[in-house]
Amino acid sequence: MGGVKCGKSFIGQQVIFDSEHPENIEIGDYCAITMRCILLTHYVIPRGSYHDYEYGKIKIGNNVFLGANTVITKSVTIGDNVIVGAGSIVTKDIPSNEIWAGVPARFIKKYN
């Protein structure tokens, strides 16, 4: 987890943090990042004989639950008090107090 900014949170087994720029990942307090989640802060874009990279930060608020095998892509902010269902792929920001799931992840309902 070298470089990842992480509060008082649970990190499950086999979680993968982007090794290129782990400093671009921030996790708040009281989160559960469960087994085999992947947090990616960059994409590789093939351009003929070379590759371009696109980078972005991932910010996860407080009291967030990421179900097993969830993928968070670059440039995503997840608010406070959020649940993301297992196996979801999160490609856009999630506001506070919501439940999201699916591929790609989509709004399910408000979370009180």
Residue positions per predicted region:
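Flexible, glycine/small-residue-enriched loop-and-beta-strand segment within the central core
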Residues: 12-77, 103-104, 109-112
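A generic structural motif
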Residues: 22, 95-96
